[in-house]
């Protein structure tokens, strides 16, 4: 293979890794609380997120390397692409993939838990008094981390002794027979990878749909300065109405509240309490408006106003991207259910992938590297961003109980580590979703083609120079023997297909997890409309002058911000 082309491909991957480190660092810096930062926790979080995203971002490099062995125009291998050279490429990629997957599992099950317990064991008073040393703290964190290490060892042993997948009567695996694993060590590692991917896919189906549904709304919503002005006006209106209603009640009794009925006295007490709340809110709004008058904030606000049309366009584009990916995922899921030759017996693997719009775009763009890499990076960041928004909106939960809430500048190191663990597992689920569901055709063979013409001799390749109509795209299962000699599947698709084929239960669970993912987006949007309608009714009830003791004014993100600031101010 030409050395300059290899250098270009790997140089693009190094640039992507640098960008991933920057993205992970910015994410951790934005959400972590500045008052309780830990350099070790920050390093583990940044390194874990960057490592997981680097695993996903290796796919275009994989596709570019294996596709460079074939001339797509003629459907035959390049002169230098002997079987020995092709095996070297796939072997080196396999080592890199296994190393990254092993690193990902190590970070999820060892690195993040150890950092969590290391931070939990810190006692400032004991440390200053000299009673807590680094060795004691290290040993205490290691004792708790041993539980997670035991879980990993147990999973590896289960995979090591799990029975090997064999061909079943009536279900001839054919092409897929070469994907069956005979090595016990590789079988155990594949089981561990499949188990972690199952957990990640469940979290991916829970968090990511809600985040993807919210992304366009984040671009289309009003700016903060405009929302502050609107909130200030509505607060002043509610305060005037409140005081007018108090004057009406006081006018009935001539200033002596003892003459009022029990119902009117309760209403008057409620109005007095609400007046105090509205006055405090108004002061917070005025303080926020004074901050907005500083020149950096003014310049930023004007810049946001100028870029407002582009934000609207970006929100619309995000909506179209989300809709396109949803349709592509649905097409692949239905294709697996209907056209899989052995259904759940072999993990719903496909003999031939049907048309997929997103996969088709990637195949066409991959003919001009790194165009496909840029589009792929944008798609991955889109899903990762949606996952972050979903985790922030839902929080870290155990069943229905919220354990930690993720907020900008207010996330503790413990919550940051748990959020990182959730995002790393989600990224593993995202890796399977993109490779096997979103772009299966591109992820398997890319732009590879083969010449469907019988060669003149067994040692020569088929020549379609004068028969261009016989140049066909590669697929997982082709009727021509020339395809088996010419086409080389990517290493990423080979590893993930082995997970589904050697452990059919994993393949079935991963498929049905994507059904939950597809159903999750619409359900989240429906809940959002119901919540907005509820708040609108409460606000209308208040403005009609029917105070209710348990009433809440219509809430927005900025109102919540002001309330949180008020409670912090009150505690101080």
UniProtKB/Swiss-Prot annotation:
Pfam families per record: LMBR1 (PF04791)
UniProt keyword Transmembrane helix, yes or no: yes
Transmembrane segments: 8-28, 40-60, 95-115, 145-165, 188-208, 314-334, 374-394, 421-441, 499-519
Gene Ontology BP annotations: protein localization to vacuole
Gene Ontology cellular component list: vacuolar membrane
UniProt-annotated location(s): Lysosome membrane
Bilayer topology term: Multi-pass membrane protein
InterPro entries: LMBD1_LysCbl_Transport, LMBR1-like_membr_prot
Domain of life where this protein originates: Eukaryota
Residue numbers spanned by region Disordered: 522-544
Predominant cellular place of this UniProt entry's protein: membrane
GO molecular function term, any single one: cobalamin binding
Keywords, ordered alphabetically: Cobalamin, Cobalt, Lysosome, Membrane, Transmembrane, Transmembrane helix, Transport
Keyword Ubl conjugation: no
Leader sequence residues: none
Family per record: Belongs to the LIMR family. LMBRD1 subfamily.
PANTHER family in the cross-refs: LYSOSOMAL COBALAMIN TRANSPORT ESCORT PROTEIN LMBD1 (PTHR16130:SF2), LYSOSOMAL COBALAMIN TRANSPORTER-RELATED (PTHR16130)
Protein role: Probable lysosomal cobalamin transporter. Required to export cobalamin from lysosomes allowing its conversion to cofactors.
Name under which the protein is recorded: Probable lysosomal cobalamin transporter
């Amino acid at each position: 293979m030409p050395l300059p082309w290899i250098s270009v491909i790997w140089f693009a991957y190094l640039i992507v890794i640098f960008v991933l480190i920057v993205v992970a660092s910015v994410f951790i810096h934005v959400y972590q609380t500045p008052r309780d930062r830990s350099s070790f926790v920050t390093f583990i979080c940044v390194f874990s997120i960057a490592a997981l995203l680097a695993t996903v971002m290796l796919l275009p490099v994989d596709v570019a390397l294996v596709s460079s062995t074939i001339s797509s125009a003629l459907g035959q291998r390049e002169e230098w692409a002997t079987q020995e050279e092709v095996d070297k490429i796939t072997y080196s990629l396999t080592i890199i993939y296994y190393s990254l997957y092993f690193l990902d599992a190590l970070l999820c099950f060892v690195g993040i838990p150890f950092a969590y317990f290391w931070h939990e064991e810190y006692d400032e008073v004991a440390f200053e008094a000299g009673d807590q040393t680094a060795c004691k703290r290290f040993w205490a964190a290691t004792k708790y981390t041993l539980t997670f290490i035991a879980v990993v060892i147990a999973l590896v042993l289960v995979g090591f002794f799990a029975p090997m997948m064999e061909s079943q009567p009536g279900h001839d695996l054919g092409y897929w027979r070469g994907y069956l694993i005979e090595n016990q060590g590789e079988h155990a590692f594949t089981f561990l990878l499949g188990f972690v991917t199952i957990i990640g896919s469940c979290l991916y189906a829970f968090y990511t749909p809600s985040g993807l549904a919210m992304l366009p709304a984040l671009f289309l919503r009003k700016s903060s300065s405009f929302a502050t002005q609107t909130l200030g006006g509505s607060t002043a209106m509610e305060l005037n109405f409140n005081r007018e209603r108090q004057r009406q009640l006081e006018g009935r009794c001539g200033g002596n509240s003892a003459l009022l009925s029990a119902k009117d006295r309760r209403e008057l007490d409620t109005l007095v309490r609400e007046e105090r709340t509205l006055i405090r809110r108004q002061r917070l709004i005025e303080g926020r408006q004074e901050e907005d008058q500083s020149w950096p904030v003014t310049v930023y606000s004007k810049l946001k106003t100028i870029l407002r049309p582009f934000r609207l366009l970006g929100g619309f584009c995000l909506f179209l991207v989300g809709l396109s990916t949803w349709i592509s995922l649905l097409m692949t899921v239905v294709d697996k259910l209907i056209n899989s030759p052995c259904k759940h017996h072999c993990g719903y693997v496909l003999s031939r992938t049907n048309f997929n719009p997103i996969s088709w775009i990637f195949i066409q763009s991959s003919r001009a590297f790194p165009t496909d890499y840029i589009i792929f990076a944008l798609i991955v960041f889109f899903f990762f961003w949606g996952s972050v928004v979903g985790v922030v909106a839902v929080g870290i939960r155990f069943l229905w109980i919220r354990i930690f809430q993720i907020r900008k500048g207010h996330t503790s190191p413990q919550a940051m580590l748990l959020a990182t663990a959730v995002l790393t597992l989600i990224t593993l689920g995202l890796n399977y979703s993109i490779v096997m569901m979103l772009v299966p055709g591109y992820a398997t063979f890319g732009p590879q083609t083969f010449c469907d013409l019988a060669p003149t001799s067994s040692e020569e390749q088929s020549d379609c120079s004068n028969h261009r109509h016989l140049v066909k795209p590669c697929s997982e299962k082709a009727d021509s023997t020339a395809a088996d000699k010419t086409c080389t599947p990517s290493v990423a698709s080979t590893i993930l297909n082995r997970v589904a084929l050697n452990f059919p239960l994993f393949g079935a669970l991963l498929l049905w997890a994507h059904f939950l993912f597809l159903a999750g987006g619409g359900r989240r949007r429906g809940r959002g409309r119901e919540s907005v309608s509820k708040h609108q009714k409460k606000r209308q009830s208040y403005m009609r002058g029917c105070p209710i003791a348990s009433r809440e004014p219509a809430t927005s993100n900025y109102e919540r911000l002001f309330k949180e600031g008020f409670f912090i101010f009150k505690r101080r």
